[in-house]
């Protein structure tokens, strides 16, 4: 994985020291099935069962760089899957000196929610109270726990996510795939959002109940 991380840095996909440190510390091999451990360092999505995948490292790096997770933040992670991205976010938001920092991860498929919990537990993020994994429909966010500093979605929506946008704090960021593009939304004030589109990606569809 070190070689791949260095390549992503060289190619300009990875720039932020905290995100680079997270990718070096939270090992992808700890979030896949035993039969695929030898493929953990490959820059490709891998199956995790139930028609879902663990995203390729390049895509995860790209989305984390857009999101810019920081210590002490409260982040909603929709589509926990294997738990890898959730654990990377937890590494970034953990704030040992000042406390705070939470990642609330939502996974629709019960078996994957349990898989994510088991994998994340290897890093003690659940035990420390940094990560909570909820089994349920995250496609409309978690209004009762809003607002969030950041929201990230790991599966592709079909249209602009108005309900998720409303759950951001002012200045907050939402990173979400819509069809074959990754979109970044930054909340400027109550009504207005800055948005950017980055085309050329493929994702599994966002499941809603």
Language-model features: where?
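Class I SAM-dependent transferase core
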Residues: 1-76, 84-92, 112-124, 193-208
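Conserved nucleotide-cofactor-binding alpha/beta core module
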Residues: 68-96, 100-194
